[in-house]
Amino acid sequence: MKLRIKAYAKVNLTLDVLSKREDGYHEILSVMQSIDLADVIEFEKAKEILFECDHERVPKGEENLIMKAFNAIRDRYFLNEGIKIKLFKNIPLAAGLAGGSADAAATIVALDKLWNLNLTEKEMEEIASEVGSDVPFCLKGGTKLASGRGEKLQDLEGIPLNLLLVKPDLEISTKEVYTEWDNSGFKSLNSTFLFVEALKKGDLLEIARNISNDLERVTSQKYRVIEDIKKSLIEKGALSASMTGSGPTVYGVFNDVEKLVRAYHDLKGVYPFVAISKTIDKGLEIL
């Protein structure tokens, strides 16, 4: 039996960093949003563990969240099963788009089905939380208000948004960005509540005005290109532009599709990754 799953990326429409926890993580408040950029993963029963990927820089050990999810399930349920996994990578690495977390979420769903585990929703959420902070969101997808370290999720009614994603030639360590935040003395902008109110009204201009990311302040200080991309997107007609996650990907929100397409063509030769995307209401899709 073979299973193919689309694992969708996410953007942070807001990200408030509230405090550092005793366990080393940070308390956050964030509106997380699934987008239609996706990796595709094939899973097949096997006697041994085989992992293939069409991107040579994807790690194959425990630092790969697919393998972390695989081992978490095997260890939790004392299993000795093998698996063959093929990953077709479309979400850029270390980009703030939760590509690794989305792949891990797909792995949890796939192993549940292939190994007939009949996991409850609560069990899946526990495994997801153990694997990574963004994995619980990627398991559910859509539009969510995330709190705790990102694993506590509350449903929100989303709004269709047209986005242009731009990733400069950088790969940024999430851990390093949070360390820089801790050392910066910055306080959270606390933008999430205003954003949620705008979302409830369905007012696109107010939504765009309240898109914000605390971590952008430390990342853009170190990497000027973040501000350059934001400025360029605004000049080309975006209602707003913001970094997602710990970066370095920046997205612009457009309400004029012609301007969006023009901006895509203008920027695609300038930066290594530029993609048109839109918001969706799911994190995973079985093909």
UniProtKB/Swiss-Prot annotation:
Annotated pathway: Isoprenoid biosynthesis; isopentenyl diphosphate biosynthesis via DXP pathway; isopentenyl diphosphate from 1-deoxy-D-xylulose 5-phosphate: step 3/6
Disulfide bonds: none
Active site: 10, 134
Residues at which ATP binds: 92-102
Annotated keywords: ATP-binding, Isoprene biosynthesis, Kinase, Nucleotide-binding, Transferase
Keyword Transferase tagged: yes
Pfam families: GHMP_kinases_C, GHMP_kinases_N
Key word Magnesium present: no
Catalytic class of the enzyme: transferase
SUPFAM superfamilies, sorted: GHMP Kinase, C-terminal domain, Ribosomal protein S5 domain 2-like
Alphabetized GO MF terms: 4-(cytidine 5'-diphospho)-2-C-methyl-D-erythritol kinase activity; ATP binding
Enzyme Commission code(s) on record: 2.7.1.148
Gene Ontology biological process terms in this record: isopentenyl diphosphate biosynthetic process, methylerythritol 4-phosphate pathway; terpenoid biosynthetic process
Catalyzed reactions per annotation: 4-CDP-2-C-methyl-D-erythritol + ATP = 4-CDP-2-C-methyl-D-erythritol 2-phosphate + ADP + H(+)
PANTHER family linked to this entry: 4-DIPHOSPHOCYTIDYL-2-C-METHYL-D-ERYTHRITOL KINASE, CHLOROPLASTIC
Role noted for this protein: Catalyzes the phosphorylation of the position 2 hydroxy group of 4-diphosphocytidyl-2C-methyl-D-erythritol.
Cross-referenced HAMAP family: IspE
Family note: Belongs to the GHMP kinase family. IspE subfamily.
Record protein name field: 4-diphosphocytidyl-2-C-methyl-D-erythritol kinase
Upper taxonomic lineage: Bacteria, Bacillati, Bacillota, Clostridia, Thermoanaerobacterales
